[in-house]
């Protein structure tokens, strides 16, 4: 099965984001312990997740080849969904699944499937930026590098 044929779903990542959001800012040793545990598992899921990046093309998207790879024609332009960033000027919007993606962008936008790694050099990333901060995450390059370092021994 081609990677492109596998539905984009990240239930493990969504679970840990929701638990972190429900926990809020830890203000007791018990909550601090839970936060560290939740964040560890969040990082584990984050590293293996594939996301949907909202993309609006100006022109027709070519069909994918037999491997599921789409190559854009020379001169084709597209917009990526961005919002004002914290550490960097702009933040890219990433979604864990098509339901959350469509809730925010409807049918007018297409989705570009990407892992998080390699997308933080120029922009921060907002995961599931649907207006409910407790159900999403804001990822900077430094946070992502710390997560990768913490999980090196897991690989």
Tell where the protein language model's regions lie, with residue ranges.
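An interfacial alpha-helical scaffold signature
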Residues: 1-155
